[in-house]
Regions:
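Extended, low-polarity transmembrane helix blocks
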Residues: 1-92, 99-174
Length: 174
């Protein structure tokens, strides 16, 4: 059984901040799903909404990678199935993090997704804002921190989730 958050991070204020950080990153994923699905006028307008025939992953893979070293690889991934995989990933990661459940699985999925996004935009190419660190890398590091500190236990349902029979038998679901 994993250790409770109170034994991993003993400072209650620090646990609250970790819980808030988990909620914030979870909302980044969840909001991205909602905006791309319904075209809420933030990063996605209604005409490009997924429900209106928009292709969120395909658009990213063919647009953000233009002129980048790995463009041909990422453009080859721009298929309709990738839209479903991307959107379900955003939804699943977002819901898991907001609720504080399945944080291990959400962290692994999120780090993989963000790793692909990091490589797609190739920040090391001349002209980017920072050749090493961008938001994808920062979010990935936060995702790694969340299950390591049992951040789902504070301001979330992590403690309850870890006690479920199926989760105790399949610890990757923690």
């Amino acid at each position: 059984m994993p250790r409770p958050a109170s034994t991993v991070v003993t400072s209650k204020p620090a646990r609250v901040v970790l819980g808030l950080l988990r909620l914030a990153v979870g909302f980044v994923f969840l909001w991205s799903f909602l905006d791309k699905t319904f075209g809420l006028h933030y990063s996605t307008g209604p005409s490009r909404a997924w429900i209106n025939g928009g292709t969120p992953a395909q658009s990213y893979l063919t647009g953000a990678t233009t002129g980048k070293p790995l463009a041909s690889f990422f453009e080859s991934l721009a298929v309709p199935a990738m839209d479903w995989l991307f959107m379900m990933g955003l939804l699943g990661i977002g819901v898991a993090l907001v609720l504080g459940i399945g944080t291990r699985l959400a962290a692994v999925a999120g780090v993989v997704m963000l790793g692909f996004m990091y490589a797609a935009v190739a920040p090391w190419v001349w002209g980017s804002l920072n050749p090493v660190v961008n938001e994808h890398l920062v979010y990935a590091l936060v995702l790694i921190l969340i299950p390591l500190t049992s951040a789902g236990d504070t301001l979330g349902l992590g403690s309850w989730w870890k006690g479920l029979g199926l989760v105790t038998k399949l610890p990757f679901l923690i």
